[in-house]
Amino acid sequence: MYETGIRPTGPFRKCSKVVGDVMGNYHPHGNDAIYGTLVRLGQNFSTRYPLIEPQGNFGTPDDPPAAMRYTESRMSSLSSQLLDGIDEETVDFEPNYSGETTEPKVLPGRFPNLLINGAEGIAVAMATNMPPYNLKEITEAVKFTLKTKDPKPKDLSLIHISEPTRRTP
């Protein structure tokens, strides 16, 4: 989305276009997984801090989203912070699956997305369910850790981070 200009200040684009671009350039394993991920990243009941700004029927906890040809999206302002500096050689790139283009090995991310949005998924013989934490509390903890020279476990116990927030469908 970043490469094609579907950014927070730009126009919304059909989700089918986004899915096609992702499938063609980065993930050739089917559109259902890609669209499902795009939808979840725009649902405020699935993601604590949405990374996609949705337009159209992205579903409810009880009902599925409309087909990708009827929905539109663009990056949220928060998601642009995950890519800030990507054009400034801040991360390494590697060839994509076909070798036609490159993709970042990691995102330069200005915030810890895994901690604030959590993660859940299933793979072969494994499952994970990491609930999200509060962005402000995580930010304060990171700032404290960066300011404190050689922090000890006792110092880290002074940081207040509430229990993770559990998502409820």
What positions do the PLM features span?
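N-terminal amphipathic, basic-rich helices that act as targeting or association modules
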Residues: M1-A33
